[in-house]
Amino acid sequence: MNTELTINQENKTKVHFVDSALINPTNPITVNLIGAGGTGSQVLTALARMNHALTELNHAGLFVRLWDDDVITEANLGRQLFAESELELYKSVALINRVNRFFGTNWKAETQKFEKNGLGKLKSNMKSEIYISCVDSVKSRFDIAEILNELKIDKGYYRNQCKYWIDFGNSQFTGQVLLSTIGNIKQPNSEKYETVENLPFITEEFGELLKISEAEDNTPSCSLAEALEKQDLFINSSLAQMGSSLLWSLFSNGLTENRGFFLNLKNFHSKPINL
C-alpha cells in the first residue's frame, strides 16, 4: 500500500497555486515595473489591457509604478514604443502619460533607477505585490534580488506584501521569462496535485549563467540600425506578449504548471520551464 501511495505521489503534476490575495483583492494589486525600454514599454501596454480586462471581470485591477531614469533617444524609435515628439522625455513619464490618457488609469512614473537611496536604505514606494523586471544588465538583476530579499524579511500583515517577481531577459534572437516567489506562498492541500510553495529567484537558479553572459558587450546603441544588430526587431514584443500571458494565466486560472519559458525567435521554438 505504501509503495502504491509513493507511485501516486510521483505521478502527481507539480503546480503552484497563486496567493489568494491576488485572486479576489479589495484594492488594486500593486505592480512595480522596472525598465521602460524595448520589453518594458511593451509589457506596460499589456498590463494596461490586463487591468481593463480584470476590472470588467469585477476584479480590483492593477496599480502600476514604472521605474526608469533613461530618456528617449533616436535609437529608441521603432524598436521601442516611442514617437519623435517624445524625444528627450523620460521614458517612464512618456509611457505612463500615454497609458493614463488612453485607459483612464492613474499609474505613476519614477524617473529614477529601482535602487536603494544614498544611505543604502529602501525607498517607501518600492513595496508592491508583484515585481516585473525588464532590465538589460546582470548587475541590475542582482541588485533587484538583494532588495527583494530585504523586503522578504518584513512579512507583517499589511497591504502590499511582496509576493512575486517576473523577470524578462533577452539577447538578439533569444529570451526567457521566469516567475519567482518572494519567500514561500502558502499552498492549499491537494489530492490531485503536488503543490510547490517556493519558486527560486533567477539569480539563484541561473546565477552562474547570468554572470557568464555579463561578459558580452552591453554598450549603448547610437542608432536604430546599431540597436537591431544587438536585438531583433520583434524579440522584445514577442517576449512581452508571452510573458504577460503567463501573468494573465495566474489571474484567470489561479494556478500554473509552468513558471516561464525559453524563446528562440530565429527558429520559432519555445520551451516551457516546468515547476
Language model features: what each stretch is:
Residues N2-T39, V43, S137-K139, D143-L275:
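Glycine-rich phosphate/adenylate-binding loop
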Residues N27-L57, R65-T73:
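Glycine-rich adenosine-cofactor-binding loop
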Residues T30-I34, L62-V71, T111, I130-S133, ...:
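Extended hydrophobic secondary-structure segments that form protein cores and membrane-embedded regions
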Residues L47-T55, L81, L148-K152:
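Active-site catalytic pocket residues across diverse enzymes, especially alpha/beta-hydrolases
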Residues A53-H59, G254-E257:
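Phosphate-handling active-site elements
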Residues T55-G61, G156-Q161:
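Short helix-terminating capping/connector loops at secondary-structure junctions
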Residues A60-T105:
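Glycine-rich phosphate-binding loop and adjoining beta1-alpha1-beta2 segment
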Residues L87-S128, V135-F142:
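A structured beta-alpha segment of the ubiquitous adenosine-cofactor-binding alpha/beta core
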